[in-house]
């Protein structure tokens, strides 16, 4: 679920390859990840995401689209990871996994919006490559050193909870700055606004002249 919030297709591809090569025994509900068709689909989508995720602007659109893909997929992977257990446990795992995926996804997407505000493209590429490496390294660590992975995951969650509100405050300020910029450039009378007619100032009666009597 953690990896799904960062790069879903890389997570599926790595898990599928580890399962099909015998380096990892997947739970029965996740054995489908080793199917060649699933591996090819995950590999193709990872290839597309590799370039989309490193293109400023495109990466944000990609993240918005995958809000509706990563979170349900993360919940499904978490439910499948617990194996054949009581349905209540599977549902609980899905809820926790979906929430974790949503938090990671929101942190990634919000951070990318702020990074895209930078005029140079290298920070975008660096962040994307770090995410790719982090997903693979995290899954391998979970496989070989599960307790170390759990400790790192707890640290990651603490940092995410601390960082997420600050990221979205930054996104809100950036959005407000962009809105103010276009509002300042808007010509008078735009969007159907009517300019008020300027009326001449009222004439005061001249001194020394009598008022008309009734």
Label for each model-derived stretch:
Residues 184-214:
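Long, low-complexity, intrinsically disordered cytosolic termini of multi-pass membrane proteins
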């Amino acid at each position: 679920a953690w990896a799904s919030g960062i790069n879903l297709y890389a997570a599926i591809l790595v898990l599928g390859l580890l399962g099909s090569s015998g380096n990892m025994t997947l739970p029965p509900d996740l054995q489908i990840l080793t199917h060649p068709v699933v591996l090819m689909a995950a590999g193709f989508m990872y290839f597309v995401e590799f370039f989309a995720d490193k293109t400023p602007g495109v990466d944000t659109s990609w993240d918005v689209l995958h809000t509706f893909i990563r979170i349900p997929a993360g919940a499904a992977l978490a439910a499948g990871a617990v194996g054949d257990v009581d349905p209540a446990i599977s549902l609980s795992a899905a809820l926790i996994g979906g929430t974790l995926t949503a938090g990671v996804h929101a942190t990634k997407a919000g951070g990318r919006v702020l990074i895209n505000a930078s005029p140079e493209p290298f920070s975008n590429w660096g962040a994307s490559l770090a995410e790719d490496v982090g997903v693979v390294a995290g899954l391998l660590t979970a496989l070989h050193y599960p307790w170390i992975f759990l400790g790192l995951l707890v640290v990651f969650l603490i940092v995410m909870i601390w960082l997420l509100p600050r990221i979205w405050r930054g996104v809100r300020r950036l959005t407000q700055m962009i809105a103010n910029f276009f509002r300042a450039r808007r010509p008078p009378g735009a969007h159907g606004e009517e300019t008020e007619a300027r009326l001449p100032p009222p004439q005061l009666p001249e001194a020394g002249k009598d008022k008309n009597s009734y």
